Amino acid sequence: FGERPYWWVHETKFYGAGPAPSLQQFPITCETGPGSPSGHAMGAAGVWYVMVTALLSIAREKQCPPLLYRFLYIGLWMLMGLVELVVCISRVYMAAHFPHQVIAGIITGTLVAEVVSKEKWIYSASLKKYFLITLFLTSFAVGFYVLLKALDVDLLWTMEKAQKWCIRPEWVHLDSAPFASLLRNMGSLFGLGLGLHSPFYKTTKMRIMSAPLRIGCIVISVSLLHLLDGWTFSPENHMTFYALSFGKSAVALLIPTTLVPWALSKIYPVKTEGKNL
């Protein structure tokens, strides 16, 4: 279920006495977490599903002509399908996932996006609620791990397999371990709460931003997030590594929700409540 091809071919009895296939490994092959479902396929499906449905919703609100809307509908879904195909093929090609795992990722990502997009409470929830949810989910996951550990169930079994079968030790990255993924997600949730309750966000929300300014926010945010993504930490001290991963993920949500829009609204005058600043 959670096996990855690059170690599974060495341990399976499927091939009997015959030789196992020789799978080429890459610097991003040796991920250390369980492989099902594919996180990359799931993330891509979730993001693209939200973008496509949002654009189609805007087109309906603008009363787009039926023929143009139909072309837009087909084109956007085909584009999403093409992106997903590229993501899935790349994950299978680099021996990080089996085909059924990327398919499971697409289905899971789409379902999560559909459910979460209908939940509006995330915009009105208090900062205290964000903090308590983050604390509860983290504590529950850690407590569940400790309980299973006491029952001799090792949830980190994939780490040993990755270290054993990866052809180069430096390719085994701690940031793909289950706990690192958990803290990244919790950091993102907490960062979203901080961003939505920041005084900078409240100030920017009251202002009417033009289309060029919004495009500028997107471009600058993506650029800064790309730079932030390249910021890596030493895995020598696990506690420090996990704490910095949590903080990095929180900052990643603050950049597009609060920091960049606020900075641009200060640099370029925008309208607020019918007045020019």
Curated annotation (Swiss-Prot):
One of its GO terms (molecular function) is glucose-6-phosphatase activity. It is an enzyme of class 3 (hydrolase). The keyword Membrane applies. GO terms for biological process: gluconeogenesis; glucose 6-phosphate metabolic process. GO terms for cellular component: endoplasmic reticulum membrane. A motif (Prevents secretion from ER) lies at residues 274-277. This is Glucose-6-phosphatase catalytic subunit 1. It comes from Haplochromis xenognathus (Lake Victoria cichlid).
